[in-house]
């Protein structure tokens, strides 16, 4: 009898532990208005600390669902932006950011939220289907960020992200021009390379752009234009290997 009683006690304890675990591990979909907002935030924090960032974001959003406009809602939305960003769920992060900024534009957390929103675009540049659109969004979003927060501690990071995105776009345009050259369409290549020169002030790609222009000019027999571009390169990019290559290209063509 004592043995059976002992087994029953162990079983009862086990069941109680399971119930407690189930309560503490409640899924985001199981949250309701009966939960306190602070409890939901805590569940999100626990998931975040364990590295379950997407689930943490889901928890935080539940606060907005059941307790909009509350102090906890402001906190929950800002945490959702962060959590989804770290989970690389960039669209979810931006949706949470947009909701936060529309509800709490004067919040002390708005700067951080907008930073994450801008950075999410930049981090999508390596996604082939999004690359150029993401780069343009990265630039425009961070320009808006710097306009609103010119003295931000994240200013240098924002400026670097803008510079990297612009450099990426120049590289993409250069590749288009080079594609035209390979397809034996130097006229289209020239238009592309000239546009890059007209719209780009600073880029590590500019010496190659001028070199490719010379290539294109020579293919069309435009010796004068090729010579002028090579002279420009000597003045502008005197230490570049592309300038040396352009000189060899001119010499090989027989242009004086």
Model-derived features: where do they sit?
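Sec-dependent bacterial lipoprotein signal peptides
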Residues: 1-23
